[in-house]
């Protein structure tokens, strides 16, 4: 039986978790449509939760995290995914309760996979990952309502994966982007991504009048939630 290596989190006693690289057999994977040899994965916040024993994300351990993966199909039960095709898997249950991308192999339903576009390298697909997919869907939702060129847009949680990609894409599409962050040493990083203005999170919260402030933003992408989201909602144009 073919062996492979995987990152595995194990519950050694109640609410105590260790992690290590382990040798696994293909028989350890769930039986499914596609057996994929993983080339790259990416690191998401949900992966960190799973890897450290958060049972709201992963119910049973031992477990291999990794909610994103790209790789080559080695076995297939679906003619739309021939052997040696390059595929991307993001989301669904991968890395949550199904062994994930922090492994040399995954086995998943074909409905979870998409053929990787030829113009996108495997490494680039995981650089984008779930964070980039989420940012892209947010921007598409804005585009469905209005043209992005010239609008005033605000992005919270701007140094994170979703936030930073949103800042870069909105700027590239011609929006005037304001980035909100709690990280004082990241202002130049956000300006380099294309933000015209960077506001400290606490300063932003103090500057907004509630319940209804002055309408400043044509669109917003919020990652932070809580008070930040409330303040954004108060200062949107309606």
Label the model's feature ranges:
Residues 126-203:
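Mid-domain Rossmann-like dinucleotide-binding core that forms the NAD(H)/NADP(H) cofactor-binding site
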Residues 87, 153, 216, 220:
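Receiver (REC) domain switch-region micro-motif
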Residues 30, 82-83, 121, 148, ...:
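Residue-level recognition of short, solvent-exposed, well-ordered loop/turn junctions
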Residues 18, 90-157:
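NAD(P)H dinucleotide-binding glycine-rich loop of Rossmann-like/cofactor-binding domains
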Residues 25-43, 54-94:
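Glycine-rich beta-strand-centered segment in the early N-terminal region that forms part
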Residues 2-7, 34:
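Short structural boundary motif marking the start of a folded domain
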């Amino acid at each position: 039986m073919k062996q492979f290596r995987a990152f595995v989190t194990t519950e050694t006693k109640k609410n105590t978790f260790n992690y290590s690289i382990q040798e696994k057999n293909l028989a350890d994977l769930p039986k499914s449509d596609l057996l994929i040899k993983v080339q790259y994965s990416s690191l998401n916040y949900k992966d960190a939760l799973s890897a450290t024993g958060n049972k709201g994300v992963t119910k049973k351990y031992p477990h291999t995290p990794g909610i994103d993966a790209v790789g080559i199909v080695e076995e297939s039960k679906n003619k739309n995914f021939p052997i040696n095709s390059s595929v991307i898997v993001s989301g669904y249950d991968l890395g949550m309760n199904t062994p994930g991308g922090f492994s040399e192999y995954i086995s998943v339903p074909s409905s979870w996979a998409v053929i990787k576009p030829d113009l996108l390298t495997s490494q680039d697909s995981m650089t984008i990952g779930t964070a980039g997919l989420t940012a892209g869907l947010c921007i598409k939702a804005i585009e469905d309502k209005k043209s992005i060129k010239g609008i005033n847009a605000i992005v919270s949680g701007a140094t994170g994966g979703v936030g930073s990609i949103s800042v870069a894409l909105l700027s590239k599409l011609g929006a005037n982007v304001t980035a909100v962050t709690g990280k004082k040493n990241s202002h130049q990083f956000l300006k380099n991504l294309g933000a015209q203005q960077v506001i400290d999170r606490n300063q932003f919260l103090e500057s907004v009048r509630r319940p209804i402030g002055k309408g400043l933003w044509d669109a917003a992408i919020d990652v932070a939630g809580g008070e930040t989201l409330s303040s954004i909602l108060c200062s949107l144009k309606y």
